[in-house]
Design a protein with these regions (language model features):
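Juxtamembrane intracellular "pre-TM" segments in multi-pass secondary transporters
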Residues: 94-123
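Cytoplasmic helix-loop-helix junction between adjacent transmembrane helices
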Residues: 14-51
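Hydrophobic core of transmembrane alpha-helices in multi-pass small-molecule transporters
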Residues: 8-22, 210-224
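Symmetry-related core transmembrane helices of the 12-TM Major Facilitator Superfamily/SLC fold
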Residues: 75-90, 277-292
């Protein structure tokens, strides 16, 4: 609100993003501390629902405030809402006292995420999977507009279906997977297959109806992938400092954001949409291969621990 000039504005955005990105690992660590181990996946899913709800309501509320008040009013409401959230956390989240067993486990868990090879492979696979996923919010809308000549309203309906499906189906879907006892890596591999199929549909079926099939496949993959990927990272953080582990996991998302949008737009500019979608399908296949390596490494570790 009070910043004037390009570079001061850049500095203020940097500070804002630094604080917000520092908040995300703390959220994951809080889930680890306040939820039971068997409920971690659903706890992450509930957190994702809250974030998606904020993303859905935020632009609409912000637009109303800008229209009827001003940008300054938006900044004041935004700041006050952050203070309100902090106050709610202070009141509602009672500091949890560690038990003697938890303190003993924390004393033994001195692992570093930078020396945890399976975890680093997991992060790399996460980047390879997230980059294609992000295309649905950057380059795929361009594809809708330029190739299929969809209006902004139609594009908004397609993207809005993503949020609606997540709101209605994600929690029941995760609960179903847990009841059936599907392994996490099986669910992750299936989710990557759904991501890949969403791009294959865009290439092989250039019909408007199949754009809906693509967004449904992508959304189903998203609902299955990210809760279980977060759960794997949370469980792995038991080996060391949870904050360091989850901060590195958050960084992997930031890396995907940094390179994903630019990579997609440049591929389209040089090779067109069809080759770009095949490239991202291949990237997803590599990501699935990395997940297989992670699963093998973790299984080998588990077998070695049992022998010891």
């Amino acid at each position: 609100q009070f910043v004037r000039g390009f570079w001061p504005f850049c500095a203020s955005v940097f500070v804002l993003m630094l604080l917000s990105d520092g908040f995300r690992p703390a959220l994951f660590v809080a889930i680890r501390g306040y939820s039971k181990p068997e409920n971690r996946t659903r706890a992450v899913t509930l957190l994702r629902l809250a974030i998606n709800l904020g993303f859905s309501l935020g632009p609409a509320i912000g637009g109303l405030i800008i229209t009827h008040v001003s940008y300054e009013g938006l900044f004041w409401v935004d700041g006050i809402s952050c203070f309100a959230a902090a106050g709610l956390m202070l009141v509602a989240l009672v500091p949890k006292r560690s038990t003697a067993e938890e303190k003993a486990q924390a004393a033994l868990a001195k692992g570093s995420p930078y020396r945890d090879r399976p975890y680093l492979f997991l992060l790399f696979s996460s980047i390879l999977i997230t980059i294609p996923f992000l295309q649905y919010f950057s380059t795929v809308p361009v594809f809708y507009s330029e190739v299929h000549r969809l209006s902004e309203f139609s594009i908004g309906l397609l993207l809005g279906a993503n949020g609606l499906l997540i709101f209605l189906l994600e929690m029941p879907l995760i609960k179903y997977c847990e009841i059936k006892g599907f392994s996490r890596f099986s669910v992750l591999r299936f989710s990557v297959l759904l991501f890949a199929l969403s791009f294959v549909v865009l290439n092989l079926f250039p019909v408007h109806a199949f754009l809906w099939a693509g967004i449904v496949l992508m959304t189903m993959g998203e609902m299955l992938n990210f809760p279980f990927m977060n759960r794997l990272a949370l469980d792995r953080s038991d080996r060391g400092q949870p904050g360091a582990y989850m901060a590195l996991f958050t960084i992997s998302w930031s890396v995907a954001h940094i390179f994903g949008h630019t990579l997609g737009l440049n591929l389209i500019a040089h090779f067109g949409f069809t080759i770009t979608w095949w490239c991202f399908t291949c990237m997803l296949a590599i990501g699935a291969g990395m997940l297989y390596l992670v699963e093998r490494n973790m299984a080998r570790e588990h077998a070695g621990t049992q022998k010891a």
